[in-house]
């Protein structure tokens, strides 16, 4: 399984992006719980979820910076 592509995250709308961030955070919580209580089925899935969350948060931040007025003016 390959790591998720950031281009896919950039194609999402604002609502979809927020939903995806929430879903990924919930998945990470489940994986952490799974790691603490028993051996995870797919150990690499934790890395992929963290990577995906970082991508989604990066895209969200890029959009925030695009929409904010420039402070240099």
From Swiss-Prot:
Enumerate the GO terms in the molecular function aspect: structural constituent of ribosome
Q: Name one GO cellular component term.
A: cytosolic large ribosomal subunit
In terms of superkingdom, the source organism counts as Bacteria
> Which Pfam family name is an example for this entry?
Ribosomal_L29
> Which Gene Ontology biological process is one annotated for this entry?
translation
Any idea which UniProt keywords this protein has?
A: Ribonucleoprotein, Ribosomal protein
Q: Which residues form a coiled coil?
A: none
Entries under InterPro entries matching the protein: Ribosomal_protein_uL29, Ribosomal_uL29, Ribosomal_uL29_CS, Ribosomal_uL29_sf
The record ties this protein, via HAMAP family, to: Ribosomal_uL29
By sequence similarity, the record places it as follows:
Belongs to the universal ribosomal protein uL29 family.
**What's the protein here called?**
Large ribosomal subunit protein uL29
**What is the protein's species of origin?**
Synechocystis sp. (strain ATCC 27184 / PCC 6803 / Kazusa)
